[in-house]
Amino acid sequence: VSEASGVLAQPFDAAAPSYDADFTERRLGRWLREAVWGYLGASFQPGEHVLELGCGTGEDAVWLARRGVRVEATDGSPAMLAVAQRKATEAKVGDRVSFSHLDLSAVDSEFRIPHSALYDGAFSNFGALNCVADRRPIAEALAGAVRSGGRVVLVVMGPLCPWEWAWHLGHGQARTAFRRFRKGGEAHVGDGRTVRVWYPSPRRLRAEFAAEFEHVETVGIGAFLPPSYLAHLVDRWPRLFAGLAKLDSSLGRFFPWTWLNDHYLMVLERKPRVQTPG
């Protein structure tokens, strides 16, 4: 694991020790992640080699590795990578998961993803791509790193979150309620630290990847369930929210819930490579 650290690293380094307790291990976090796992499991098969952007504490990489998928898990936070590496070792899947530092805050027109062979697919879960103002260089880099027909699964925070509007307007916080409409606004990442975030619409994200990737489907994740900072509500009324979780899984694939949600999941497929005359 590289010791390099970019501007994104410090807030996530600070959040790393408590991230699983604050999100992954709570009821809401489990429901949201299991919804994503359904799509990861359908997109990546045992024996395939996939790339993860923004692996965090490694929960998704370990889950895929247990299913026989080999994962190159990357993150910009050395502390997150350290937690993820320990988790993979404890789960006895260290032979199927490798970890490396990849700083998405350094994305520019020259951004590249190192690879010795083409990946069978790639994914990024729970908003890692929201930390990037323009994701087109990432799309171009993934196009160069993923084989033809390979799936790319992206889970991104969108701009239209009714739960956020209702909660913050109900508490007299109009500016916070509509913060997702501001470009490059600040979001809290535990321990009082903040990062700059952008909230692309499904239409914009699809357009950013359109040159090299076909759109397969878009699904709302957290259309009826609240954002993670309201996990205490789910803990207080679990039966009520279990019903909303079922609505999430049954209606999230339909409009308007593909747009009205905390996150949306987009499945893309690498277009066939154009063969150039040799």
Where are these regions (language model features)?
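A short SAM/SAH-binding and catalytic strip from SAM-dependent methyltransferases
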Residues: G121-D134
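Acceptor-substrate binding/catalytic loop of class I
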Residues: H188-R204
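Class I SAM-dependent methyltransferase SAM/SAH-binding core
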Residues: T57-A106
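Conserved class I S-adenosyl-L-methionine
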Residues: V1-Q45, G47-G56, E59, W63, V153-R182
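A C-terminal cap/extension of S-adenosyl-L-methionine-dependent methyltransferases
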Residues: R203, A207, E217-V274
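A short glycine-rich, Lys/Arg-flanked "PGG" loop and its adjoining helix->strand segment in the class I
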Residues: R136-S148
